[in-house]
Amino acid sequence: MLWRSFFLIFLNERGLFTNLSEIKNPEDIKNFSKKELATLAQEIREKIISTVGKNGGHLASNLGVVELTIALFRSFNQKNDAIIWDVSHQCYAHKLLTGRFEKFDGLRNHGGISGFTKMAESPYDYFDNGHASTSISSGLGLLTARTLLDNHKEGNNSESGKVVAVIGDGALTGGLAFEGLCHAGQLQKNLIIVLNDNQMSIGRNNGTFSRYLSRITMSSQYQSIRNGIDNFANKIPLINKFLPKFIYKFKRGLKGLFLANNMFVEFGYEYVGPLNGHDIHEMELVLNRVKKLNKPVVVHVITRKGKGYKPAEKDPQKFHGIGPFSIEDGSVKGPVELTYTDVFSNEMVALGEKNKKIVCITAAMAKGTGLDAFSRHYPERFFDVGIAEEHAVTFAGGLAKGGLIPVVAIYSTFIQRSIDQIIHDVALPNFHVIFMLDRSGAVPNDGETHQGIFDIALMRSIPNLTILSPASAFELKTMLDAAIDMKGPVVIRYPKLVCSEELDCFRAALDLGKGILIKASDLKSDSKSKSTSKKSCTLLITTGSMINETTSAAISLKAKGISADIYNLRYIKPIDEEYLVSICKGYKKIVIVEDGVKQGGIGEYIEGVLLKAKLKDIKVLGFPQSFISQGTRAEVLKDAHLSAQDIKNAGI
C-alpha cells in the first residue's frame, strides 16, 4: 500500500525503522529505545494483519499481546528462561521475534509454520500447545525438573532459569489451570504467571471468575498508592535506610486492606497488578522485580483484544479465528455457503421453540458451535460454562437426571478432555444427553492439536452410546430431530465443511443400525463413462463427510468401466451386523473409508464383521496412528491417503 511505503520512509529517515525481518532472536531488541520499541510493535502488527488477512488465523488475540511479548523478551534471558504460552494461538509476535520472519508468510499453510507453538520449529517453543489451561501445570513441571536437576549438580551455583506461564483470563476458567495454581502455591517455587486479562476467551467471558477479575481490576488504587510510597522513599534515602521495616509493614497493611479477598494471595502468591498490558516500560519494571522473588507470582496485565486494527477491536470475537479477509474493511473473502454448523444452529432454534425441555451447553464457544442463535432466543435455557468441558458434561448429566434434554456442543478435539465424564456421569447411568461434535474428522489449517480424528475410536467402546454421522444437511436435521426422542446418550459428529450435495436417498427415514445404499447408476457424472456391468462389483462403505471423496471416487471408477456402489453407514454405533453382511454379499471388492484413525475405528470393526461372515478382499482406509499436520482439507486427506484418487485406486 502507498501509505505504508511513505510511512516506512518517514521512519527510516528518523532512525526509527527497526527492520523486523533482521531480528533473529530476542536479544536483538534488548537495546531498543522507547521510540524504536513503539515502531517495532507497529511493524509486528502490520505483519500479523497482512499475513492473517491472506492465510486466515487467530488475529484479535495476537494483536492484543504485542507489547506484552516485547516486554517479556526484554525482561528475561531466553537462553535460560522459558516463556510458555497457554493455548499458544497468541504466539505470532513470539514467532516473529524468534527468527521466523522469513517463514511467517507460510503461517498455517501446508508445510509452513504452525499457528501454535511447536517444539520442532524452535528451541524457544517449549511445548506443543493448542488446548487451553495447560501452561501453569507444564510450567510448574519444567521449573521443578530444572530445580531438582540443578540440586544434583555438584559445585553448580548457576540459576536454572526462570519459567513464565502466560495465560488468558478465559483459559484460567479451566479446571486444570486451578489444579496447577493450587500445586504451585503449595510448592512455593518462583513460577511467574502472567495473567493476560482481555475479558475474552473466544467470546466475552461469563461467570463468577470473570466478575472476580473485574473486582481485582478495581484494586488499582492499591498499586498506585504502593508505587507512590516507593517513589517517595527512593527520593529520601534516609527513610529507606532507617525505616525499612516500617515501610514494609505499612505496605503489607495496605495490601491487606485492598487485597483482603484476593484469591491469588490466599493461594500463597505474590500478586502484582493490574498493569497496562500495552505499556512496555511499566511491564518491564514489574517483571524485572518479580523474577527476583522466591515465591510464585501472578502478574495481572490488562490488554485489548484486536488492538491496532479497528475491525478487530470492534468485533474481537469475529476476528478470534478467521479465514482470509479484506484488510481494508475486515470483510471475509469468498462466498458464504451453508455449513453443517449453520444447519445445527438453525435447527436448534426451531427445536427449542417446539420443546421447552431442550437446553444447550457450550464451553466458551457459543459462536463457533452456532449456539449463539439459541442463546439469543432462549437465554434462560443456554449455559456457557467457560473452558470447562469436564464440568459441561457432568452438568449435562445432572440436567438430564432432572428431566431436561441437554444438548452439549463441543469441538471434537475438545471432547477428548471429558471422556471420563461421558463414561462415568452420562453413559453409566444412561442419561439422555445429546453431544454435538463439531469439527470432526479432518480440520484444515490448525494442525495436530485440532484434528477431530480420535472421537470414533475413543467413543465406540463406551456402552449405551449411540453415534451418528450425517452425510448432508438433511441428514443432520433428521438425526438431531431423532436424537431428541431417543433414550440414553447420543453423539452426532459433523465436519467443519460446507454441506454436501443432497441426494434423494438422504431423505430416507432413519432405521436403527442401518445405512442406505447408493447405486452407481444414481450418481451424476459429467463425463462419458465406459459401459459397465449391470451388477456392481465394488462397494465403497463410508460415513459422514467422506461421502464427498467417496462419491468422486465412484464416479471416476464408473468412467473406467467399474461399477461401484456406495453404502452410507449413517450409524457408527450401533451397527446392524446382519443387515450389513446382507448388503455386502455379492460384491467382489469392499473398501471402507472413514475420517478417523484406523486403529479402533469403524473400519476395523466392520472388517472384522465381514471376515467373520467369510467375505474377502476388504480394504480399510483411515487416518494412520499419528498426529496429522496442518493444510487444507484436500492436502490433509492426500497426506493420509484418503483423497478421492486414493479411494478410487483402492476400488480398482
Task: Please identify what each model-predicted range represents.
Residues L20, Q199-F344:
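Long, well-ordered, tryptophan-enriched scaffold segments
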Residues H58-L187, K357-I358, T362-A363, L371-D372:
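Cofactor-binding active-site loop characterized by glycine-rich and histidine/acidic residues
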Residues L243-P311, H432-L437, I456-C505, A644-I652:
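Structural signature of the thiamine diphosphate
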Residues P324-I327, V332-V336, P444-D446, T466, ...:
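Peripheral docking tails and interdomain loops at the edges
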